[in-house]
Amino acid sequence: MANYFNTLNLRQQLAQLGKCRFMGRDEFADGASYLQGKKVVIVGCGAQGLNQGLNMRDSGLDISYALRKEAITEKRASWRKATENGFKVGTYEELIPQADLVVNLTPDKQHSDVVRSVQPLMKDGAALGYSHGFNIVEVGEQIRKDITVVMVAPKCPGTEVREEYKRGFGVPTLIAVHPENDPKGEGMAIAKAWVAATGGHRAGVLESSFVAEVKSDLMGEQTILCGMLQAGSLLCFDKLVAEGTDPAYAEKLIQFGWETITEALKQGGITLMMDRLSNPAKLRAYALSEQLKEIMAPLFQKHMDDIISGEFSSGMMADWANDDKKLLTWREETGKTAFETAPQFEGKIGEQEYFDKGVLMIAMVKAGVELAFETMVDSGIIEESAYYESLHELPLIANTIARKRLYEMNVVISDTAEYGNYLFSYACVPLLKPFMAELQPGDLGSAIPEGAVDNAQLRDVNDAIRSHAIEQVGKKLRGYMTDMKRIAVAG
């Protein structure tokens, strides 16, 4: 099979990369009605599989789970989760032939085997759903022409999808119809009903394409979302300890620092995150972030180039075929790093202390978010998509590090994200070591003293922060989510 994106001509590639439309609330007036009375069969019962299924059932849809025969007979975790939540469970052969919509929510690595198993069992005119388009775009999976292929991609982990639904809200979501598989022209109606059933329509929906979702998703997770957090954690910890900081304190400052810093990012973007600093610290964080952007820009561009060309995917799929040798080696090496094995700090670190003593970490977040966004937009991805795949998801990933350090992050994210994370961090750590050697007192681990600042310089820095394109689009999208949340709570 050929990489689907590489079979398109340049005009088609640009059109699909640039497909992004923020959908109005009135477009979801019918809710999930298009799928009511139809049979929806979910394949896979992991975090997305279970939590999307719970939401869809609560929205009035007929949901069941198709699992491999051995998963049922051996009562594996997927079988236990589905049955404990009261769902009907059966084998592929028992459930797929009656399904109107088959939703494939297994890991990327399993998609080809799953799709090749279920396709022959699907009835004529049925629909196949994904929450990530890797199998279609990068693997180039060929789907029967009578089958409609759609995507609903929540921009949050599965647990968050469920929690927001229970609060009467939802999570921002991308939806798409594969242009090669929409024989009856009903793909968008199916996708809209599916996303409404998950609650995503209450938080904002982007009509996108399989191509735009995959290329932007890969770029975000490899660079700012996972790779930058891993590289930053290792670099900052080693720097602190080398300068005499207690390893336990250094570990806590970093482990919980990312979450604290990005909580401000979630509420008010880069502007609010930078506003948490004193004026001298803000000026220093800005200067550091500009240096970091200059150093890292070629690395971010290389990752985007390799994602667009398919070089990244072909390399990762070769590792799949080699029993994940590279992935497992990198995972083991990460687990042995000084940061991962450092003792826990029993004392308390106040919220503001994370900002005051983490100026470099704030600079890394700012540089990484802006670079990921800029690199995606320069490659033809629309700003709204680039925002969701950079700034929006960062607090969610930072939260996983706060739970169990890098181990937890790499367990929670997909194998695809983990592989890309290692590629980036293994290149980024040596790249930034000369920069780390030139840091000044107050950049990390101690606060920058209060002092006089140049008013004109502070004005210009504030203007530069606020006028960046990601701040403009972010303010619009966060405002929409806030407005929608008020409506959901009120109604």
UniProtKB/Swiss-Prot annotation:
Details of cofactor binding: Binds 2 magnesium ions per subunit.
Magnesium recorded as keyword: yes
Residues reported in the UniProt entry to bind Mg(2+) 2: D217, E389, E393
Residues of the active site: H132
Every KARI N-terminal Rossmann domain range: 15-208
Pathway this chain belongs to: Amino-acid biosynthesis; L-isoleucine biosynthesis; L-isoleucine from 2-oxobutanoate: step 2/4; Amino-acid biosynthesis; L-valine biosynthesis; L-valine from pyruvate: step 2/4
Recorded catalytic activity of this chain's protein: (2R)-2,3-dihydroxy-3-methylbutanoate + NADP(+) = (2S)-2-acetolactate + NADPH + H(+); (2R,3R)-2,3-dihydroxy-3-methylpentanoate + NADP(+) = (S)-2-ethyl-2-hydroxy-3-oxobutanoate + NADPH + H(+)
EC number of this enzyme: 1.1.1.86
GO biological process, one term: L-valine biosynthetic process
Gene Ontology cellular-component terms listed: cytosol
Chain ranges of the KARI C-terminal knotted domain: 209-344, 345-484
Keywords: Amino-acid biosynthesis, Branched-chain amino acid biosynthesis, Magnesium, Metal-binding, NADP, Oxidoreductase, Repeat
Cited NCBIfam families: ilvC, PRK05225.1
Biological function: Involved in the biosynthesis of branched-chain amino acids (BCAA). Catalyzes an alkyl-migration followed by a ketol-acid reduction of (S)-2-acetolactate (S2AL) to yield (R)-2,3-dihydroxy-isovalerate. In the isomerase reaction, S2AL is rearranged via a Mg-dependent methyl migration to produce 3-hydroxy-3-methyl-2-ketobutyrate (HMKB). In the reductase reaction, this 2-ketoacid undergoes a metal-dependent reduction by NADPH to yield (R)-2,3-dihydroxy-isovalerate.
Stated family: Belongs to the ketol-acid reductoisomerase family.
Matching PANTHER family: KETOL-ACID REDUCTOISOMERASE, MITOCHONDRIAL
Protein name: Ketol-acid reductoisomerase (NADP(+))
Native source species: Salmonella schwarzengrund (strain CVM19633)
Gene: ilvC
